[in-house]
From Swiss-Prot:
This is Voltage-gated potassium channel subunit beta-1. It comes from Oryctolagus cuniculus. SUPFAM superfamilies: NAD(P)-linked oxidoreductase. Residues 30-43 have a biased composition (Basic and acidic residues). NADP(+) binds at residues 108-109, 115, 137, 210, 240-241, 266, 295-300, 306, 316, 375, 377, 381, 384-385. Its EC number is 1.1.1.-. Coiled coil: none annotated. Signal peptide: none annotated. The keyword Membrane applies. Homotetramer. Interaction with tetrameric potassium channel alpha subunits gives rise to a heterooctamer. Identified in potassium channel complexes containing KCNA1, KCNA2, KCNA4, KCNA5, KCNA6, KCNAB1 and KCNAB2. Part of a complex containing KCNA1, KCNA4 and LGI1; interaction with LGI1 inhibits down-regulation of KCNA1 channel activity. Interacts with the dimer formed by GNB1 and GNG2; this enhances KCNA1 binding. Interacts with SQSTM1. The gene is KCNAB1.
């Protein structure tokens, strides 16, 4: 039956495996009378018994590798059949954890349950998933919980394997009552239960503390996060908008009391905001293994180019609750940023990409970034931003230096000062 399933490709691999097995046996016990082989045999015979056993072990390891590759191809589980290979979407480890996440993820802030319809949300998730994205991020506060409801409904409707997804949510603002907000043990446990009900999931892969809470002792926060992980409600936990000192304190408390430390920090990162991700988080990564999941690669749409001639009516900055964004755009600093974006346009044209694609690829060129969360309100925007994957190989050191010379905002680490 197994032979029947292999087909022509399986037979060929089986033949290669058989040949390699014969070669291994031949080299281990037979003699070749050709001058070249004879000299090699003399050389082999001069090896000590331990040396010969090491050679034999290497041959057997190679044989096992060939047979394993043959079996994986037979089961369509080889590297050529993985989602990363077939879609071209690179995957990276989340910090120093073993969790593999697509280097681009889809966020739901503002869009799901607010700026877009449920139908558009489904279309966006479908495009992302079929493009190799496995990371979907939300929060209990997004659209007062509606974003989680929409995200969970789409996952259930699509029938995607839960094991193929990385779902993350964030806790802090759960309701109007004092006990429904913050990072108390009560709200972390009850808030996550509420999120799981809205998502229609048994667990999330990562639960984030959406901001620091000065009213709750760090030990209580870490104990509560450890508890929800031990209860199977989450796989990992992380922080969002925490300072490096606060993250380090959480790690120290976790190690002191044999609890689970955070694996990731969610931080804003784009062409005009760099210091935390480029200076502070790399130190934390090397010291305690905390990775970076970044958001707002287009600076809430500022880098998209849509605000070059003012604020369009359909844009995010035109919404009542985003007057702060409008003020930022029309400010003196905002006008300077728009001028810098115009100077970056020739670089994008030379690389054959759009300015948003250049901006996202610029974020990805930082190997310390585990994943960049995209926020799109239309399928066209999402497809354009996903195209940054093709631009990433073009982000050479020369191109990065060109961008730095225009931005003139590169932060300096302690290492730079020492050098």
């Amino acid at each position: 039956m197994l032979a029947a399933r292999t087909g022509a490709a399986g037979s060929q691999i089986a033949e290669e495996s058989s040949k390699l097995r014969k070669q291994a046996a031949f080299s281990g016990g037979s003699k070749d009378r050709s001058p070249k082989k004879a000299s090699e045999n003399v050389k082999d015979s001069s090896l000590s018994p331990s040396g010969q056993s090491q050679v034999r072990a290497r041959q057997l390891a190679l044989l096992r590798e060939v047979e394993m590759n043959w079996y994986l191809k037979l089961c369509e589980l080889s590297s050529e059949h993985t989602t990363a290979y077939t879609t071209g979407m690179p995957h990276r480890n989340l910090g120093k954890s073993g969790l593999r996440v697509s280097c681009l993820g889809l966020g739901t802030w503002v869009t799901f349950g607010g700026q877009i319809s449920d139908e558009v949300a489904e279309r966006l998730m479908t495009i992302a998933y079929e493009s190799g994205v496995n990371l979907f991020d939300t929060a209990e506060v997004y659209a007062a919980g509606k974003a989680e409801v929409i995200l969970g409904s789409i996952i259930k409707k699509k029938g995607w394997r839960r094991s193929s997804l990385v779902i993350t949510t964030k806790l802090y603002w759960g309701g109007k009552a004092e006990t429904e907000r913050g990072l108390s043990r009560k709200h972390i446990i009850e808030g996550l239960k509420g999120s799981l009900q809205r998502l229609q999931l048994e667990y999330v892969d990562v639960v984030f503390a959406n901001r620091p809470d000065s009213n709750t002792p760090m030990e209580e926060i870490v104990r509560a996060m450890t508890h929800v992980i031990n209860q199977g409600m989450a796989m990992y936990w992380g922080t969002s908008r925490w300072s490096a000192m606060e993250i380090m304190e959480a790690y120290s408390v976790a190690r002191q009391f044999n609890m689970i430390p955070p694996v990731c920090e969610q931080a804003e990162y784009h062409l005009f905001q760099r210091e935390k991700v480029e200076v502070q988080l790399p130190e934390l990564y090397h010291k305690i293994g905390v990775g970076a999941m970044t958001w707002s690669p287009l600076a809430c749409g500022i880098i998209s180019g849509k605000y070059g001639n003012g604020v369009p009516e359909s844009s995010r900055a035109s919404l009542k609750c985003y007057q702060w964004l409008k003020e930022r755009i029309v400010s003196e600093e905002g006008r300077k940023q728009q001028n810098k974006l115009k100077d970056l346009s020739p670089i994008a044209e030379r690389l054959g990409c759009t300015l948003p694609q250049l901006a996202v690829a610029w974020c990805l060129r930082n190997e310390g970034v585990s994943s960049v969360l995209l926020g799109s309100s239309t399928p066209e925007q999402l497809i354009e931003n996903l195209g940054a994957i093709q631009v990433l190989p073009k982000m050479t050191s020369h191109v990065v230096n060109e961008i730095d010379n225009i931005l003139r905002n590169k932060p300096y680490s302690k290492k730079d000062y020492r050098s």
